[in-house]
Amino acid sequence: MHIRILGSAAGGGFPQWNCNCRNCHGLRQGTLRATPRSQSSIALSDDGANWILCNASPDIRAQIEAFPALQPARAVRDTAIRALILLDSQIDHCTGLLGLREGCPHEVWCTEMVHQDLTTGFPLFAMLEHWNGGLHWKPIVLERSFAVDACPALRFTPIPLRSAAPPYSPHRHDPHPGDNLGLLVEDSRTGGTLFYAPGLGRVDAPLRERMRRADCLLVDGTLWRDDEMIHAGCGSKLGSEMGHLPQSGAGGMLEVLDGLDGRKVLIHINNTNPILDEDSPERAQLVARGIEVARDGMDIDL
């Protein structure tokens, strides 16, 4: 299984266009040892030629330009993107579909809940019907494994997660199973297994056992502390209110990962998170625990 980190930041990217927090200011001024990051998305392949996107970042055009494997190379106009899987309907995970309209029709896998959001509050399916048939919905049934024809060696098991639906969802304050997914991806040829969950609000015992099966954990790294947005002067909500488990504190992501084997990589990192500063004590804690911070262009093979 080939995994390409197309984007590794949370919504807004890093630096965020309207943010002057310590991290964003330091990166722009060159006083912070850190790397710019685009909004999160990954690509998966079982052969290096045909690819599946997991989420479609608003930065998808630049991400394709940075990854030759996705660029047109077989015809005057074509793409190696054979399908897309949406783990939720958050604006930073599906707006990239608009930028892919010239390549429609696209095969899009998502749950009934996500499909509802993208036909009502943010009606991408209806909008894109006008481009060569638009998006062909392939329903994801919770806990039922599925395969995508273009990458037959990969088996996807969708796992419902506790998180939050986006503000435009008709059930924003009434969570439903299927609003947010994690994916357990297994390669039948190599035996490699990936657990991918860029939006993860809570880890219970059954989910922990699922995570224990994975050779690589690619998980929510949004915030270091639950009140980080408030502390940085960038917002008024706790991470837990937005559906993100912070890294620090009792029951935080560090504590969860400490009890698990396999490669551990944080993704979907908010611009305020001190782990972006490569010289920060928080980053040093990750290094000491053997936890990596995803970066754009990172490759993982399982």
Swiss-Prot record:
Protein family: Belongs to the PqqB family.
Bilayer-spanning residue ranges: none
Gene designation: pqqB
Function: May be involved in the transport of PQQ or its precursor to the periplasm.
CDD domains: PQQB-like_MBL-fold
Keywords: PQQ biosynthesis, Transport
GO biological process per UniProt: pyrroloquinoline quinone biosynthetic process
Keyword Nucleotide-binding (UniProt): no
Name of the protein in its database record: Coenzyme PQQ synthesis protein B
One Pfam family it belongs to: Lactamase_B_2
Lipoprotein listed as a keyword: no
Gene3D superfamilies registered for this protein in UniProt: Ribonuclease Z/Hydroxyacylglutathione hydrolase-like (3.60.15.10)
Pathway, per record: Cofactor biosynthesis; pyrroloquinoline quinone biosynthesis
Species in which this protein is naturally found: Azotobacter vinelandii (strain DJ / ATCC BAA-1303)
InterPro entries, per the entry: Metallo-B-lactamas, PQQ_synth_PqqB, RibonucZ/Hydroxyglut_hydro
